[in-house]
């Protein structure tokens, strides 16, 4: 059974990643109304008779979201049953399921009633939490902790502050990026790093949205760089923290490069999807570090208790 659960966890993780990228594809191609204002049917039909490209994209996204719902539900039930001895299992299972349902309902509401761009931008963030929760659940199932000796990890307050702070802030950056997409502001500023050679400062809403995201992205790049330097200096003996921050910096660097290329490639589809891919992976890594941070306090208490007993 454990072998089956491992395969299920991998397939579920991949399916949720496809859902995330599919949502970005729907937004990028303007396919949100590919099935009209009909849900769960498509244009009022179970199998649509007229298949335009927008309809195919929207319908494919709905199907992958539906399959993800089934897989996540099954994974939550099995992990709850067979891995309940691991402290985080129940919490992650609940988060995976609840946020997947929330993003599905929000997606349906957007189709039927429509939503403001500011509200639609939350949709990607909700999906991201479900994805990260399933990734963490998969890590627990594959016992990644034991390979990195993460169960004995103890961090200082400074490192935990950076882990929690960067993760929370990354969610804000994700929201600003999703807002850029839903406001159709990807090309509002044709230059980089300033908005325009002739107008360095934004002058209208779309430019402010674009430049706001750029500033937020620059700050998270600098923050992750600083945290990585701390990890390299002080956590060489803790591989999971050491490599966690190095991987985070690699991902945020790739994210920044692709973000710049979005501007200079006229917001090409491939760059837009890569942009969503890298931020999804980065958020999952940061969430894993958060999970380790919550354990650190417990590990420190256990170490102190053991020390007292030996004395």
Curated annotation (Swiss-Prot):
Which InterPro entries has this protein been placed in? Answer: COX15/CtaA_fam, COX15/CtaA_HemeA_synthase, HemeA_Synthase_type1
Localization per Swiss-Prot or TrEMBL: Cell membrane
Residues bound to heme o: 61, 123
Q: Does the keyword Electron transport apply?
A: no
Entry keyword set = Cell membrane, Disulfide bond, Heme biosynthesis, Iron, Membrane, Metal-binding, Oxidoreductase, Transmembrane, Transmembrane helix
Q: List the disulfide bonds.
A: 35-42, 189-195
Reactions the enzyme catalyzes: Fe(II)-heme o + 2 A + H2O = Fe(II)-heme a + 2 AH2
Extracellular side of the membrane: what ranges?
Answer: 28-62, 113-121, 181-211, 265-271
Enzyme type, top EC level? oxidoreductase
Its placement in the membrane is given as: Multi-pass membrane protein
Q: Does the keyword Oxidoreductase apply?
A: yes
Q: What is the protein name for this chain?
A: Heme A synthase
- Gene behind this chain? ctaA
């Amino acid at each position: 059974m454990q072998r089956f659960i491992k395969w299920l966890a991998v397939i579920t993780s991949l399916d949720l990643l496809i859902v995330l990228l599919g949502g970005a594809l729907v937004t990028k191609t303007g396919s949100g109304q590919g099935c009209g204002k009909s849900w769960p049917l498509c244009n009022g039909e179970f199998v649509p008779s007229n298949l335009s490209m927008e309809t195919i994209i929207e319908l494919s996204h709905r199907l992958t979201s539906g399959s993800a719902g089934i897989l996540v539900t099954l994974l939550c039930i099995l992990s709850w049953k067979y891995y309940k001895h691991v402290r985080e299992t129940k919490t992650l299972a609940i988060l995976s399921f609840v946020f997947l349902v929330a993003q599905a309902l929000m997606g349906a509401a957007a189709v039927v009633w429509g939503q403001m761009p500011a509200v639609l931008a939350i949709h990607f963030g909700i999906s991201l939490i479900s994805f990260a929760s399933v990734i963490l659940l998969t890590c627990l199932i594959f016992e990644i902790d034991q390979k990195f000796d993460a169960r004995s990890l103890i961090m200082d307050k400074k490192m935990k502050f950076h882990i929690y702070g960067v993760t929370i802030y990354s969610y804000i950056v994700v929201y600003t990026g999703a807002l850029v997409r839903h406001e159709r502001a990807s090309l509002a500023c044709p230059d980089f790093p300033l908005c325009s050679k002739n107008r360095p400062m934004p002058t209208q809403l779309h430019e402010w949205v674009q430049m706001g995201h750029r500033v937020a992205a620059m700050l998270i790049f600098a923050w992750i760089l600083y945290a990585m330097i701390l990890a390299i200096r002080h956590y060489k003996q803790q591989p999971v923290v050491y490599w966690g921050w190095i991987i985070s910096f690699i991902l945020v660097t790739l994210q920044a490069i692709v973000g710049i290329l979005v501007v200079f490639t006229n917001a090409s589809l491939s760059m837009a999807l890569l942009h969503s891919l890298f931020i999804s992976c980065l958020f999952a890594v940061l969430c894993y570090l958060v999970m380790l941070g919550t354990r650190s306090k417990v590990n420190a208490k256990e170490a102190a208790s053991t020390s007292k007993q030996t004395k």
